[in-house]
C-alpha cells in the first residue's frame, strides 16, 4: 500500500508511547521536518513537560498551528484489537492511541506547512507551531507556560488553528470557534457525627445540605446566547459516612462543575453559590478551581479562511460550535489571537480501539494548506 506523506508521518508519531506528560520524541520528529523547510526550532521544557515553539518568519501576522503530542492512557491492553502503539490499518481505518486525538492532525499540519512553503517560500508574515506534551494532564507546564514566555518577549499570535478532533459525522462538518468556561468546586459541609437512633444528638450534613444542593441543581444561571448554550451545573461526586448503617456522618463532601457561557463570570457564579449555601444556614468550606475562561472567535479572517477551505476541499458547509470540553485554546485566546479548532472525527477519542478514517487524512492536509493559502499567500 502506498502511504501518503500525512499517513506515513502519522504512523511514525503513533508508534511513540507518549502517554501524558511524556513526549517520547514526537516533537523531535516534527521539529526535524520543520527545520528542513526553514523553521527556527525552540524546545521549551518546563518541569516534566516538553514543549515546542517553531517559527518560520520574523514578521507579522503570525499563523500558528497548535496541538499536543501526549495521549491518554490506553486502558486495558487486552481490550484492544491491536497494540495501541503499533498502529494498524484495517478496513480503511487507522487504529492506535492518539489516532484521532490528535497525532494525525499534527502530521497534517507538518505536511501542509511543507507544501505551502515549497509553493510560497516568501510568504507573508510567519508560520508557527506551538506543541505540548501536557494537554491531557494537568496542563500546568504546557501551552500556558509557552504563551507566558511569548508574551514576555512581545511575540504575538494573530491566528491560531488547534488541531483538536472537532468533526462529528464527516470531516469539517463542525469547527469550534469558542469554548465554555470551566469552574470546579469542592464543597465540605460540617455536621455532627452520631447514632442514627439518636438524631437529636447529631447533625446530619446530608439532610442539611440536600435542600441547598437541590436549589443549585434547579437554578437557571443564564439563558446562553447565540454562540453558547445556557450555563450548566453538574454534581460529579458526593461522599459522606463511614460505611456503617448506624452512624450519622459528621461531614459531607461534594464536587461540582460549571460549564459556563459568556453571559456570566466565574465571580458571579461563586457569589450566587455562596448566597444559596448561606441562605440554607450551612456550616461549610468551599475550594474553587477555575480551569478555563470562556472564549469566542467571531466570524472574521480565520473563520472565513477555514470555512472557505473546508467547502473547497470537501464540499461541506461547516457549522460553528462552542460545545464540548476545554482545550488549550483557552490559554491562547486571552492574548487576543483568533482561535479555531479543526480536526478529524471525534467519535472514538479516549476510547479502546481509537481510530480515524484513513481517507480523511489527505483532505485534512489539503484544508490546512488552503487555510495557509487564504491567509499568508503573497
Swiss-Prot record:
Pfam family, one: Peptidase_M20
The enzyme's E.C. designation: 3.5.1.18
Keywords attached to this entry: Amino-acid biosynthesis, Cobalt, Diaminopimelate biosynthesis, Hydrolase, Lysine biosynthesis, Metal-binding, Zinc
Coiled-coil region list: none
One of the record's GO molecular function terms: cobalt ion binding
Enzyme class: hydrolase
Pathway in which this enzyme or protein is active: Amino-acid biosynthesis; L-lysine biosynthesis via DAP pathway; LL-2,6-diaminopimelate from (S)-tetrahydrodipicolinate (succinylase route): step 3/3
Entry cofactors: Zn(2+); Co(2+)
SUPFAM superfamilies (alphabetical): Bacterial exopeptidase dimerisation domain (SSF55031), Zn-dependent exopeptidases (SSF53187)
Superkingdom per UniProt: Bacteria
Residues annotated to bind Zn(2+) 2: 101, 136, 350
Biological processes, Gene Ontology terms: diaminopimelate biosynthetic process; L-arginine biosynthetic process; lysine biosynthetic process via diaminopimelate
Catalytic reaction list: N-succinyl-(2S,6S)-2,6-diaminopimelate + H2O = (2S,6S)-2,6-diaminopimelate + succinate
InterPro entries named in the record: Bact_exopeptidase_dim_dom, DapE_proteobac, Peptidase_M20, Peptidase_M20_dimer, Peptidase_M20A
Similarity comment text for this entry: Belongs to the peptidase M20A family. DapE subfamily.
Function: Catalyzes the hydrolysis of N-succinyl-L,L-diaminopimelic acid (SDAP), forming succinate and LL-2,6-diaminopimelate (DAP), an intermediate involved in the bacterial biosynthesis of lysine and meso-diaminopimelic acid, an essential component of bacterial cell walls.
Protein name from the UniProt record: Succinyl-diaminopimelate desuccinylase
